[in-house]
Amino acid sequence: MKTVKYLLISIVLICSIQGCMDLNVPPVNVVTDDVVFGTEDGVKSFLARVYGAMPIEDFRYSQNNGINHFYALRSLSNLTGEALNRDVSSADHETHSYWSEAYMILRDLHYFIETLPSYQKKSGFSDAQVDQWTGECYFIRAMTYFAMVKRYGGVPLVTEVLEYNGDKLEDLDIPRASEEEVYNQIAADFDEAYRLLPEKTHASRANKYTAMGFKSRAMLYAGSIAKYNVANLVDPKTQKRLCGIPSDKAQNYFKLSYDAAKLLEGKGYELFTKAWSATDKEAQFKNFVDMFFDASSTENIFIRQYGYPTSVHGYDCYNVSRQYMTSNYSSYTNPTLSFVEMFDGFPRKANGEINVYDENGYYVLYDNPMDFFANAEPRLRATVIFPGDLFKGEALDAKRGIYKDPIGAGITRLLPEGSTERYNSAAATRDRITMSTNGNTQTVVTDSKGNRFNASGRSGPFNNDGVACLAGFGFRKLLNPNMSPDLVVENRSDHTWIELRYGEILLNRAEAAFELFLLDQGEQYRTDAYDCIKKLQERAGANITPAATNLTLDLVRKERRKELAFENKIWWDLRRWRIIELEQNNTTYRALMPFYILNEDKWFFDDRLDEDNRRYTFNTRWYYKNIPTARITESPSLVQNLGY
């Protein structure tokens, strides 16, 4: 066994990680090279470990705890306006550092790439096996550097094992590469993976087209930074631009993204339409729900598998609405009206907001709350649970309160537009509406016929209980509709995370193409962008954009935000477009509160600002994360990002 310890810059200073231990004494838990490289099983065990450590923002990711963490009560949707979370009351960013763990993965990948060839002959590995395994390492390296560059900008670029023999620690003090250099390395690694990998594998392992699919994502990010970023940080010693990419490079990166996405065309991937029908909204809804649970789906390009009891997550437990919970957790993801308003199928005000009023300014009354959503885009219905809609055979009971006054000619707006007052404390509403303080002790109301009603729904919202549908909607997307209620407990879910699907490839291709059209590269790019968007709109049951000439960049982005909602992608999109500070400038997101009218057996909806008055203001320094202070102390060549 080798006794020389190999390190990457992430592990400097040695004493801080190794406790100043003798580096020539092999740790007792280190596996020898013969065990790893001597058999196919050893290699597969290594690959399983690095695949598991690969940075993916999946079911076990949260912005405060990072990657591969069991306690994932927060998601990136809480930072984008997609959803409210009772534990998130203002704008924020990813507070967990992704630095040292990245370089530890990289060290292992480099060691594998450098060591495997020397074992090929004596272990009897074929050229095809060695190529595939090496290609997987290049793929994971590209993914790891992409996870870093989208957070920090330029980082120390290490592409081989660094040998440390105990003398010159300063040799491991590597300055940051430019952001452009890191993206170029990512592109090169994906290309090398494409060269080495086979055309077909199980979706949990990379193949040629997996590499190109992720290349399309990474290069789209790079192109956006080149075009939209304004931050500029230059290392005074190396003169490299650590944050930002020259704007004249945008076209090249968009073209790389477009070409990579187009390469997947005709390679066996397609939009999931197994239950879809062009004329049946119910089928379109069911198809979009089923898409995330069909193991044979040809839309899946790369997945992360889970399996009880060894590999689990708690997504269902944390995110089901209150009435469906069987543990101490629920309702951490609550879709906002601001999100819902992006979708088609609703009456609108002149300003584009959903309209809940008639021509006289009175609330429109409904026999059933689902009547309001009769024409809603099926993709939206598959993403959120509307009040009164079914989940696991049970209607979502979302009700803010019971309206008691006679309705006369009609009910006018309960509170002034823009109000964040609580209904139970506002003089205009506290005596007209009966509400429940919390979900444990419901207030009961009796109508003129002696019928008794809980004042608020079983899933809220309540006066003073955050375990509820905070914005009036339940959450559906990615929740297992077939999971038995008694199994909806912490760390019991084991359904698959789909990290890359063909729907995203079409979105990447459309956006890159439209950006190329805007850069005067030809009408054919706008036409291709339109064709991609139209396919997604048709599958979603959305309104179809009439023609390519009607397509805009905002429409392309909106389609992305609808299709990829709650898949932990939109936060990164808003970052690369550099628009979060425009959307979050003392912003309070909107809610849609359902009310039942006593003695009338009717419903109405009140559109309003979030009752808890959460306010979001994005700090533009968050477009680049701070490099951990300890790493800068250990490596003086590292330059901190702006604003920290």
For every predicted segment, state its role.
Residues 20, 102-105, 185, 279-349, ...:
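Long, intrinsically disordered, low-complexity segments
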Residues 20-65, 372, 384, 628-644:
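Membrane-proximal, proline-rich intrinsically disordered regions
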Residues 38-60, 77-152, 169-208, 369, ...:
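Conserved, well-structured interaction surfaces
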Residues 149-150, 156, 201, 218-230, ...:
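Short coil/turn linking the two alpha-helices of tandem helical-hairpin repeats
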